[in-house]
């Protein structure tokens, strides 16, 4: 397995750069086999994440780049992870606070929690990074998975 951080949420092999996705379902269909084969999620994860995203969209109107952070219930996750994706172009993603509004997501932080109460603190830490336009610019311009891994682990203290 690739580099892991001490907090065991970020993994270099769960960083995807510049892949083209037409919609959220295509994104989930692509990432699910990676997560399943890596032992991160159960077979039920794919359907659960699609249903949850449909009911509770997760795109945030952050600037200068839009961030989505989909997640689902803990019973679908075997071990915790954050799967970071920088899209090639953007992915149409429904806004968290306004389900009828579709944003163009640049980044996806696909979150896997396996403890019921552990996610609130993580979400707050992520949100505080997402309002930092310098951090988002660095993610956008990073050249390699390792550079992204270093940015994530040095800016998001889990």
Tell what function each PLM region has.
Residues 1-158:
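Cytosolic covalent-transfer regions centered on His/Cys nucleophiles
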């Amino acid at each position: 397995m690739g580099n892991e951080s001490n907090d065991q949420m970020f993994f270099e092999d769960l960083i995807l750069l510049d892949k083209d996705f037409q919609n959220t379902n295509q994104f989930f269909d692509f990432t699910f086999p990676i997560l399943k084969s890596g032992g991160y999620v159960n077979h039920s994860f794919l359907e659960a994440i699609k249903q949850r995203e449909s009911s509770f969209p997760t795109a945030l109107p952050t600037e200068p780049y839009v961030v989505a952070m989909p997640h689902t219930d803990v019973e679908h996750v075997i071990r915790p992870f954050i799967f970071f994706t920088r899209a090639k172009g953007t992915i149409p993603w429904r806004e968290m606070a306004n389900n009828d509004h579709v944003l163009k997501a640049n980044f996806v932080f696909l979150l896997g929690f396996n403890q019921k109460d552990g996610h609130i603190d993580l979400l707050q830490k992520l949100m505080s990074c997402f309002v930092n336009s310098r951090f988002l610019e660095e993610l956008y311009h990073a050249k390699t998975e390792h550079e992204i891994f270093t940015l994530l682990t040095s800016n998001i203290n889990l």
